[in-house]
Amino acid sequence: ETDQSTPLTPLTPAAPVETKEPVSIAVILPFMLNEETPSKSAMRYTEFYKGFLIAVDSLRSNGAPIHVTAYDTEGSVLKVREALTDTAFRKHNAIIAPDNASQLAILAEYGKNNNVKVFNTFLVRDKSYLTNPSVMHGNLPSVLMYRKATNALMERLSYSTPVFVSFKGENGDKAEFVSALKQSLTDKGNTFMNIEVDGRLESADLRALPTDGNYTFIPTSSRQADLNRIMPGIIEWRDEAVTPMVRLFGYPEWTTFRGETLDNMHNLNTTVYSRFYTHEDAPRTHDIDAKYKKWYGNRMENAVPRQGLLGFDTGMFVIPYLLHEASSYDGVQNGYFFTTAGDGAGSYNDALYFINFRPGNIIEKSRI
């Protein structure tokens, strides 16, 4: 056990602040301190914890001592059970749970029996929040994500014709989303078009489209290689025809693309849906990056999502939630907007965003 439970001394506030009960949080993750050389996965969980501690420091003037205790699961159910037998564990108001289903189940049962909130931010497909009132599911479940993205896109398609682009003999990996969107369009009597191309989209494949139209192109695949086979043809056709209004709609995976792919996404005024997004040039991002570098002497891993920012945003939500039941927080990378899943159930994070890559390298992030 790595103990970080010493309460941070609150800063002297500008105005009197009512002293609140201490907040105590257990962070239970596979830090793998038993390994001579920690794996990349273990290093990412350590980065998450470091970001979480920056959030603790940012909130230390709230009038309540904040206690954080880190427990290393070492990837073992036994270690989780061992932590629960520690009498000091009873002081915790909330648990940040690990990414293992068996370990989460043990902690969720403990939370239910002891009225302790269990925050699950790593197991996206876990469903324990549906039957356990103590579980807070940190990600919008996939089925609800597709529905929410589809409904939001339907509003944007009111004055645009959707054009679905697929490849002959190939199955796109977004068949479920595309099928749901087509069904919604059909139910509302909206027309859409299908274009199936052989190997690569050419401008000639689009010449049947009236040039005075307004089109939203929607690939049936999220793969970068497939996107690169589509965008140049759309750009060429648009530039030749001059008059059509053209935009592109896509998927969370696209937020990771860089180089020429990203340039073309900006060119085509691309919008994607995603549970999270980091605007690297935003002042808030720069501020956290600077604090992380100052505190720990290195930078966060260049990954998607960035675990240090996930830890920071998680702390910035969880601590105010424990203090005064704040149910929302729009973070640097991850937002938290919790809603109950029903009677006798826990809650889940309803946050979903549209990320718009506009011409001129402009990026806009808006909550759906």
Regions found by a protein language model. Name each.
Residues 1-23:
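Sec-dependent signal peptide cleavage junction
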Residues 26-27, 90-100, 119-122, 161-168, ...:
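Periplasmic-binding protein-like
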Residues 36-50, 171-175:
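Glycine- and acidic-residue-enriched helix-capping/strand-helix junction motifs
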Residues 45-68:
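Signal peptide-proximal N-terminal region
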Residues 77-93, 204-212:
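Short, well-structured alpha-helical segments in soluble
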Residues 96-166, 170-178:
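Extracytoplasmic ligand/sensor domains, especially the bilobed periplasmic-binding protein
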Residues 231-308:
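Extracellular/periplasmic periplasmic-binding protein-like sensory domains
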Residues 298-308, 312-367:
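Segments of small-molecule ligand-sensing domains
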